[in-house]
Amino acid sequence: MAQKIKPPQKLIAYLKQAGIKHNLLEHKTVYTAYDAAATMKRKLNEIAKSLLVLAGKDYYLALIPADHNLDFKKLAKVVAKFSGKPVKVVKIPSEKVMENLLKIKAGAMSAFGKLHKLPVLMDKNLTKVKKAVFSSGSFNHSIEMAVKDFIKLENAILGDFGIKKKAKLELKKRIKTN
Protein backbone atom coordinates (compact mmCIF):
# COMPACT_ATOMS: atom_id res chain seq x y z
CA MET A 1 0.00 0.00 0.00
CA ALA A 2 1.36 3.38 -1.00
CA GLN A 3 2.17 5.95 1.60
CA LYS A 4 0.12 9.14 1.41
CA ILE A 5 2.15 11.97 -0.05
CA LYS A 6 1.53 15.57 0.94
CA PRO A 7 0.68 17.99 -1.84
CA PRO A 8 3.89 19.44 -3.27
CA GLN A 9 4.41 22.72 -1.40
CA LYS A 10 6.49 24.09 -4.28
CA LEU A 11 3.46 23.70 -6.58
CA ILE A 12 1.04 25.23 -4.07
CA ALA A 13 3.37 28.24 -3.65
CA TYR A 14 3.77 28.51 -7.46
CA LEU A 15 0.00 28.63 -8.01
CA LYS A 16 -0.54 31.05 -5.13
CA GLN A 17 2.18 33.41 -6.38
CA ALA A 18 0.69 33.33 -9.89
CA GLY A 19 -2.73 34.18 -8.46
CA ILE A 20 -4.33 31.32 -10.38
CA LYS A 21 -7.75 30.17 -9.23
CA HIS A 22 -7.56 26.43 -8.58
CA ASN A 23 -8.90 23.65 -6.39
CA LEU A 24 -6.60 21.23 -4.59
CA LEU A 25 -8.35 17.86 -4.74
CA GLU A 26 -7.44 15.21 -2.17
CA HIS A 27 -8.27 11.63 -3.12
CA LYS A 28 -7.31 8.02 -2.49
CA THR A 29 -3.99 6.87 -3.90
CA VAL A 30 -4.07 6.63 -7.70
CA TYR A 31 -1.32 5.69 -10.15
CA THR A 32 -3.00 6.30 -13.50
CA ALA A 33 -5.11 8.98 -15.11
CA TYR A 34 -7.84 6.36 -15.59
CA ASP A 35 -7.87 5.59 -11.85
CA ALA A 36 -7.93 9.32 -11.08
CA ALA A 37 -11.04 9.75 -13.25
CA ALA A 38 -12.79 6.81 -11.58
CA THR A 39 -11.84 7.93 -8.06
CA MET A 40 -12.94 11.53 -8.60
CA LYS A 41 -16.00 10.52 -10.65
CA ARG A 42 -14.85 12.62 -13.62
CA LYS A 43 -15.04 12.04 -17.33
CA LEU A 44 -11.80 10.81 -18.86
CA ASN A 45 -11.58 13.84 -21.17
CA GLU A 46 -11.45 16.11 -18.07
CA ILE A 47 -8.30 14.42 -16.75
CA ALA A 48 -4.95 15.58 -18.15
CA LYS A 49 -2.51 12.69 -18.52
CA SER A 50 1.09 13.92 -17.95
CA LEU A 51 3.81 12.19 -19.95
CA LEU A 52 7.52 12.90 -19.87
CA VAL A 53 8.86 12.47 -23.41
CA LEU A 54 12.29 12.58 -24.99
CA ALA A 55 12.19 14.18 -28.43
CA GLY A 56 15.60 14.05 -30.06
CA LYS A 57 17.90 15.11 -27.22
CA ASP A 58 15.40 17.27 -25.33
CA TYR A 59 12.81 16.45 -22.70
CA TYR A 60 9.25 17.78 -22.81
CA LEU A 61 6.09 17.34 -20.81
CA ALA A 62 3.21 16.20 -23.02
CA LEU A 63 -0.38 16.49 -21.79
CA ILE A 64 -3.25 14.59 -23.37
CA PRO A 65 -6.79 13.80 -22.22
CA ALA A 66 -6.98 10.48 -20.34
CA ASP A 67 -9.25 9.08 -23.06
CA HIS A 68 -6.50 9.56 -25.67
CA ASN A 69 -3.23 7.85 -26.55
CA LEU A 70 -0.09 9.64 -27.64
CA ASP A 71 0.70 9.70 -31.37
CA PHE A 72 4.50 9.83 -31.38
CA LYS A 73 4.78 10.84 -35.06
CA LYS A 74 2.39 13.76 -34.63
CA LEU A 75 4.20 14.82 -31.46
CA ALA A 76 7.53 14.77 -33.33
CA LYS A 77 6.05 17.23 -35.85
CA VAL A 78 4.80 19.53 -33.06
CA VAL A 79 8.21 19.49 -31.35
CA ALA A 80 10.03 20.10 -34.66
CA LYS A 81 7.82 23.10 -35.37
CA PHE A 82 8.36 24.47 -31.84
CA SER A 83 12.12 23.85 -31.67
CA GLY A 84 12.95 24.58 -35.29
CA LYS A 85 14.93 21.31 -35.41
CA PRO A 86 13.92 18.08 -37.13
CA VAL A 87 12.94 15.34 -34.68
CA LYS A 88 13.40 11.74 -35.78
CA VAL A 89 12.51 9.89 -32.58
CA VAL A 90 10.12 10.61 -29.73
CA LYS A 91 9.98 8.15 -26.86
CA ILE A 92 8.95 7.86 -23.25
CA PRO A 93 12.08 7.54 -21.10
CA SER A 94 12.46 4.84 -18.48
CA GLU A 95 11.19 5.30 -14.93
CA LYS A 96 14.81 5.43 -13.74
CA VAL A 97 15.51 8.42 -16.01
CA MET A 98 12.42 10.15 -14.62
CA GLU A 99 13.51 9.51 -11.04
CA ASN A 100 17.11 10.62 -11.68
CA LEU A 101 16.37 13.60 -13.93
CA LEU A 102 13.39 15.08 -12.07
CA LYS A 103 13.82 13.55 -8.60
CA ILE A 104 10.24 12.28 -8.59
CA LYS A 105 8.63 8.89 -8.14
CA ALA A 106 7.61 7.06 -11.30
CA GLY A 107 3.94 7.65 -11.99
CA ALA A 108 3.86 10.96 -10.12
CA MET A 109 4.65 13.23 -13.07
CA SER A 110 3.31 16.69 -12.36
CA ALA A 111 1.57 18.53 -15.19
CA PHE A 112 3.42 21.71 -14.27
CA GLY A 113 6.52 21.66 -16.45
CA LYS A 114 7.87 25.04 -15.35
CA LEU A 115 8.63 23.53 -11.94
CA HIS A 116 10.98 21.10 -13.71
CA LYS A 117 12.20 23.58 -16.36
CA LEU A 118 10.40 21.55 -19.04
CA PRO A 119 8.42 22.97 -21.97
CA VAL A 120 4.77 21.87 -21.84
CA LEU A 121 3.05 20.52 -24.95
CA MET A 122 -0.73 20.25 -24.70
CA ASP A 123 -2.97 18.30 -27.03
CA LYS A 124 -5.71 20.54 -28.43
CA ASN A 125 -8.35 18.04 -27.31
CA LEU A 126 -7.81 19.22 -23.71
CA THR A 127 -9.09 22.66 -24.72
CA LYS A 128 -12.53 21.16 -25.40
CA VAL A 129 -13.28 21.29 -21.66
CA LYS A 130 -13.37 24.48 -19.59
CA LYS A 131 -11.79 22.91 -16.50
CA ALA A 132 -9.48 19.95 -16.25
CA VAL A 133 -7.81 17.99 -13.48
CA PHE A 134 -4.00 18.10 -13.60
CA SER A 135 -1.49 15.93 -11.76
CA SER A 136 0.18 17.68 -8.85
CA GLY A 137 3.07 15.24 -8.62
CA SER A 138 1.39 13.44 -5.71
CA PHE A 139 -0.49 10.14 -5.81
CA ASN A 140 -3.12 11.63 -3.45
CA HIS A 141 -3.67 15.17 -4.76
CA SER A 142 -4.65 16.73 -8.05
CA ILE A 143 -5.22 20.30 -9.18
CA GLU A 144 -8.45 21.36 -10.87
CA MET A 145 -8.27 24.60 -12.82
CA ALA A 146 -9.43 26.32 -15.99
CA VAL A 147 -7.60 24.98 -19.04
CA LYS A 148 -7.08 28.51 -20.40
CA ASP A 149 -5.41 29.51 -17.10
CA PHE A 150 -3.14 26.47 -17.27
CA ILE A 151 -2.11 27.30 -20.85
CA LYS A 152 -1.29 30.87 -19.87
CA LEU A 153 0.55 29.87 -16.67
CA GLU A 154 2.69 27.21 -18.34
CA ASN A 155 3.05 28.87 -21.77
CA ALA A 156 1.80 25.55 -23.10
CA ILE A 157 2.39 24.83 -26.76
CA LEU A 158 -0.83 23.56 -28.32
CA GLY A 159 -0.69 20.79 -30.88
CA ASP A 160 -2.59 17.87 -32.34
CA PHE A 161 -0.89 14.71 -31.07
CA GLY A 162 -3.57 12.72 -29.22
CA ILE A 163 -5.53 9.82 -30.66
CA LYS A 164 -8.91 8.93 -29.18
CA LYS A 165 -8.78 5.49 -27.56
CA LYS A 166 -10.85 2.87 -29.39
CA ALA A 167 -11.89 0.71 -26.42
CA LYS A 168 -15.14 2.56 -25.75
CA LEU A 169 -16.05 2.71 -29.44
CA GLU A 170 -15.58 -1.04 -29.83
CA LEU A 171 -17.69 -1.68 -26.72
CA LYS A 172 -20.51 0.50 -28.09
CA LYS A 173 -20.39 -1.37 -31.43
CA ARG A 174 -20.67 -4.72 -29.63
CA ILE A 175 -23.64 -3.52 -27.58
CA LYS A 176 -25.47 -2.28 -30.70
CA THR A 177 -24.96 -5.56 -32.58
CA ASN A 178 -26.36 -7.71 -29.74
Give residue spans per PLM region.
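Extended, low-hydrophobicity, polar/charged segments
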Residues: 1-178
